[in-house]
Amino acid sequence: METRSENIYFLEYAIKRMWMAAGATEIHADYVADAIAFAHKQGKLNQGLGVYEAIDIALEMGLLDIQSEPQVIAEGPTWATVDGNKSSGYWCLNMMADLAIEKARTQGIAIVFGGNHNDAGSFARYVYKAFEQDMMAFSSNNTVPLAAPFGGLHNKLSCPPFDAIVPAGDKSPIWASVALAEFYDADVSEAAIHKKPLKGKWLIDPESGDLSDDVTAYAKPIEGYGRVWDCSAAGQIETPRTYALNMWTEAMTAIINPIGIP
């Protein structure tokens, strides 16, 4: 098996300089570079350098305001709501995590809602901030439609990340970092580029409803990008367990969230 090594410090340096060159403040660029490098340390490369394209394309499309700053719009002793103001999720989620940690330190527990932000990369980074303070934490959000309801032919559901971490004394933490659907656009691009099947028959043909693991007929590259691909097939959620967790996360991130968008 081929082993690859990389210099995380150079990666952070390069990402920071790229985002600042695009117009970001230094603190904004620090958050982006830190989270992308963290995903590489974790071994989740699709949530690392590749996911930079997600905020770059949002910037190019005018969906991301690189000079906007997230702000707290409501709060109480154990809760808060942060409006991302169309900034990146990297900045917004760091603010949310820091606020939750600060409130939990005095109250024992806290929940912070957020919204109106763009991609945030690996959510593992934000729960790990709590672990560094000897706290347990959960973090998630909903996404653009990447999965179909049971029996559906078109994507209506998100593919939410779910990260949780619990300190374990002098041992490694109990740590979960999963997706609550079967695949992301990065999995489609990886399969297309390397001409390999997905790990399951999760593609739903929008006309026939047939299932497939072959992305060839459905995947289409977006000019100028490598990791972000269009896919004309819908995504299947394979088990009722994953489906139920997907619905639970949607309720938490979009329905009870004061500024959530289902």
Residue ranges and their predicted role:
Residues 1-22:
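Generic N-terminal amphipathic, Lys/Arg-enriched alpha-helix
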Residues 48-101:
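Active-site cofactor/substrate anionic-group-binding motifs, chiefly glycine-
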Residues 94, 98, 102-142:
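A glycine-rich phosphate/pyrophosphate-binding beta-strand-loop-alpha-helix module
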Residues 82-84, 111-116, 137-141, 166, ...:
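General beta-strand structural signal in soluble alpha/beta enzymes
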Residues 225-262:
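Internal helical hairpin/lid segments
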Residues 147-221:
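Phosphate/diphosphate-binding glycine-rich loops and adjacent basic-rich segments that engage nucleotide
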Residues 23-31, 46-49, 258-262:
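Flexible, glycine/charged-enriched surface loops at secondary-structure junctions
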